Amino acid sequence: MIIYLEGNIGSGKSTLIQFLQEYILEKKIDADVILEPVEEWQKTQDSNETNILQHYYQDQKKFGFAFQINALLSRVKKVEDQIKKSKHSVHFIERSIFTDKNVFLEANYQTGNITEIE
């Protein structure tokens, strides 16, 4: 079973997830938590060691598409990898690919940060 944890930026997802992780360990629940792959975004750097997340926040129009594709692909890979190696039957996942497409990609399109073809 997969349960996605969604919410606006700054809504308390990280706090909830931290509590959930501690509770799962304490109660020995057959579940795990898969966090958003922020560390992967921070590893994707140019020759100046500026990562893709920093680039996105500095110039959303220029890096909007590159960041959203990177976010989507890294999320899919992390979820697939962790579920394959997990022994648990329940997975709590921070954000879903549906949020990447229907919220962040759409918001970037509506604000002109990415084009229709992108």
Task: Name every feature range the model reports, one short phrase each.
Residues 8:
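P-loop (Walker A) phosphate-binding loop of NTP-binding proteins
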Residues 79-118:
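ATP-dependent NMP and nucleoside kinases share a basic, alpha-helical "lid"
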Residues 22-68:
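Conserved substrate/cofactor phosphate-moiety recognition/catalytic segment
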Residues 13:
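Conserved lysine of the Walker
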